[in-house]
Amino acid sequence: MQRIGETFSRCLRALGVLRLSLRQIRISTGLVLFTYVTTHFLNHALANISVAAAESGLLIQKVIWQTLPGAVILYASLTTHMGLGFWPLYERRNFRFTRAEATQLVLGLCIPVLIADHVLGTRVSLSLFGTQKGYAEEFLKFWVRSPTSGVLQAILLLVVWIHGCLGIHFWLRLKPFYPPVKGVLLSLAVLLPALALLGYYQGGEAILLAVDDPVWQALHLMPDHVGTAEQNAALVSYRSWFFVVLAVAFGLTLVARALRRLGEHRRGQR
């Protein structure tokens, strides 16, 4: 019995270490993604000047995030953070969350669904087909060809930002330096997405005015910028498969949780 007790204690300690490690990994990957989103929003804000200014800002983005080290860090963080998003659903003994915790969890689960179209249309399209899409092509897609997708992208912007800000708040709330600067950080947290959304609107309006110009069309409607019909159809297919994978992962998480609860219940009856 003593050996069993010692083994059980070691398992509990190991579980505690695992939970701590997963929390640290979730925070670290979340900070990487929040940094990426912040630079992305700053770039969106440049569209308040002009679409050309936003395109110029992409050069800095590429230096940071499209070099091999930056891309590896970004996509490893994205994959890991998204995978760990299912962990609270499995780990929690019950679904009693605070309102802020529930909001962050629900928003986090919505992000992969909302972001799939954008990631496939930019990074995946570039990697697979070599299409060079910038702000002009993305504004064309979201403001002219698919306004519904454009609305969803604006919603995505807010969902990602609120999810990230809640994560930062949960991480910093017990830090002694946080209360004095919380007001300033809140102001910045409101200002940056507002500027990004305004840039999104201003850039879209500029493209609506330019889209009928033959010179603009010759520059931006080439297949190497917007892709061919076959390439775009393939991206739609990949998006469908991505949604299937997400649904399976979500279902397996709930099944694993149910099996764990069943095992605990049976052990409790012995």
Give each language-model segment a name:
Residues 1-270:
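Membrane-embedded alpha-helical bundles that constitute the cytochrome b-like, heme-associated redox core
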